[in-house]
Design a protein with these regions (language model features):
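Terminal helix-turn-helix DNA-binding modules in bacterial transcription factors
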Residues: 421-455, 483
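Structural register within alpha-helical repeat arrays
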Residues: 26-27, 63, 102, 140, ...
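Amphipathic alpha-helical segments of tetratricopeptide repeats
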Residues: 44-48, 81-88, 119-127, 158-169, ...
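Basic, amphipathic alpha-helical hairpins
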Residues: 383-395, 415, 419, 437-447, ...
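Structural motif corresponding to the intra-repeat A-B loop/turn of tetratricopeptide repeats
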Residues: 33, 70, 109, 147, ...
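Sequence-specific DNA-binding recognition helix
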Residues: 442-480
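Residue register of alpha-helical TPR repeats
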Residues: 21, 58, 97, 135-137, ...
Length: 483
């Protein structure tokens, strides 16, 4: 996915915006220059030569981010855990870190709805700093794009611009350059997938219809004026992609150089994304044989049983190549696989409410659960037990601990470490979410009152309800119902 290119830059910018150690500026310079491998090598050297007590959560997190984006997923997961254990301060910081780390891992594993749930929860944290909030909004934009919701992705990026104004002059300039290129990237991606040759690309054709004139106005001019080498290189690539889609064969050599550069950086997964983008452009430009050549390294690694979101675009491109070459049966077989994956994705994505919009006071949160992916397997059972018994007013921590065979203290510690919440706080939060959903869903009909919703979810005392609800949403249940 194209977000892999921007992620390291967003990561280090968000850290620098949080008064992180000054030596992270050297990492920023390497990352802005597109030298991810060199940044990882420097980070690895630091990890090997620094005693454990001197390693900060920021250092470990950035190290894990670089590992994740360059394909070292197992090592990244371990370093995320180490970073989380280093966090000192409020429970909010722990919740933000665990949500954030789980979100990026989920996104790069193409578990898009889980990533969106995690990122959206970060945005609801009252203690989130400007850099972390912009990173979460960027993550939301990436997840929404992968779901084909380009209009909503644009809205998420637009919301970043307002937050960028809170940054220092240097950081604000970097964020604004990033936002300018992100907008241009989305415009080009949308143009490419909605080209006349791709009317049968059902996943994208069934998605929201972006107003190209409104969205594209002034976008390319802002993007071509950026000075950051990493972003400038991406803009040059996108311009060549447009040329290839228009049938200009001279663009192919430059696109091939971009592929080679990604390989030299060890950017394996991003190189996969580039191949798909280039193949789409070549197909749009009526060059199916060149598209086949670009796709061959992917074809050689497939085993025949791939069915995840990751392969959706590949099967579509391969089907179009075979159709152009009059291999009708092969094309039909590949298109069936594409259509099956596309339908699975659409069904999964349908779990996300249509009302999900960034920055609105009352928004319907994604139903995909972020807590499960943040907890170790044993303690996921405890969480699932909580969800199954939320309606019981007598649900206790002792009962939950006994259900999974651990002590109350062990359960408390695990929830604090991985969620930044105690079991009681999680129960209260989930109950308030359910009550709020009841009130919002029935606002138009008036068939549900506050007391009924509270009793349904195990809250018997009116004062307890008002205090807990106000703590979660900064308003009373009656105020929600009155909207």
């Amino acid at each position: 996915m194209f977000s892999m290119l921007y992620f390291p830059m967003v990561s280090v910018l968000s850290l620098l915006g949080a008064d992180a150690p000054t030596h992270l500026h050297s990492h920023l310079k390497l990352i802005l220059g597109g030298e991810f491998n060199a940044a990882l090598e420097r980070s690895s050297e630091w990890a090997e030569t620094t005693v454990a007590s001197e390693r900060t959560s920021w250092d470990l997190q950035l190290h894990a981010d670089l590992q994740l984006v360059l394909g070292f997923e197992v090592e990244a997961e371990e370093n995320y855990r180490r970073a989380q254990r280093k966090i000192r301060g409020s429970n909010s910081k722990i919740r933000i870190a665990t949500c954030r780390n789980a979100a990026w891992q989920a996104l790069f594993r193409y578990r898009v709805t889980t990533a969106l749930a995690c990122f959206s929860r970060i945005c609801d944290e009252p203690g989130i700093e400007a850099g972390g909030l912009m990173e979460a909004r960027f993550g939301i934009a990436c997840a929404l794009y992968e779901m084909g919701r380009i209009d909503d992705a644009f809205d998420a990026i637009d919301s970043m611009e307002k937050i960028a104004e809170q940054q220092s002059d240097e950081m604000r300039a970097h964020w604004k350059d990033l936002i300018a290129v992100l907008r241009f990237d989305l415009v080009v991606q949308s143009e490419l997938r909605r080209a006349a040759a791709f009317v049968d690309h059902v996943y994208w054709q069934s998605a929201q219809s972006m107003s190209r004139v409104d969205r594209a106005h002034g976008v390319s001019e802002a993007a071509v004026s950026v000075e950051t080498p990493l972003l400038r290189g991406r803009v040059a690539y996108l311009l060549q992609l447009r040329c290839a889609a228009a049938g200009n064969r001279d663009a192919v050599a430059e696109l091939a150089r971009c592929l080679d550069a990604a390989g030299e950086q060890g950017f394996v997964d991003f190189r996969y994304t580039l191949r798909l983008e280039i193949a789409l452009a070549l197909l749009a430009g009526d060059a199916p044989n060149l598209a086949q050549f670009v796709l061959e390294p992917i074809s050689d690694t497939l085993h025949g049983a791939e069915s995840s979101r990751r392969y959706r675009e590949y099967f579509y491109c391969a089907a179009k190549v075979h159709l152009a070459q009059d291999h009708t049966q092969e094309s039909l077989a590949l298109y069936r696989r594409y259509a099956l994956i596309a339908m699975r994705c659409l069904r999964e994505d349908a779990l996300i409410g249509r009302q999900f919009l960034v920055g609105q006071e009352l928004k319907q949160l994604p139903q995909s659960d972020d807590v499960t992916v943040r907890l170790p397997l044993k303690y996921r059972r405890a969480y699932h037990y909580i969800l199954q018994n939320l309606n019981r007013s007598d649900l206790s921590v002792r009962e939950i601990a006994a259900e999974i065979g651990v002590t109350e203290r062990a359960l408390q510690n695990a929830f604090k470490i991985y969620l930044g919440l105690s079991p009681r706080e999680l129960i209260r939060s989930r109950r308030m979410e359910r009550i709020r959903t009841e009130l919002v869903d029935f606002t138009l009909t008036g068939e549900r009152n506050v007391k009924e919703a509270a009793r349904k979810w195990g809250v018997q005392n009116g004062s307890t309800l008002v205090i807990a609800y106000r703590k979660e949403y900064d308003e009373t249940p009656s105020e929600t119902l009155a909207r």
